[in-house]
C-alpha cells in the first residue's frame, strides 16, 4: 500500500527531524528513542511486507 509506505516514511522523517532540530533534551527523548528503536521496528515491519 502506497499510503502505508508514505505514512512510515513520514514517521521516519519526523523522528530524524526531532533529533536534528532538538539535539538537547528533546533530541534524546524523541529523536533518540524514536529514531533508534522506531527505525528498527519500521525496517523489520516493512521487509516481510514486501
Curated annotation (Swiss-Prot):
Concerning Pfam families, the annotation shows:
Fungus-induced
Entry coiled-coil feature ranges: none
Q: Where are the transmembrane segments?
A: none
Q: Which InterPro entries match?
A: Celegans_Fungus-Induced_Rsp, Fungus-induced
Q: Which PANTHER family match?
A: FIP (FUNGUS-INDUCED PROTEIN) RELATED-RELATED, FIP (FUNGUS-INDUCED PROTEIN) RELATED-RELATED-RELATED
Q: What is this protein called?
A: Fungus-induced protein 3
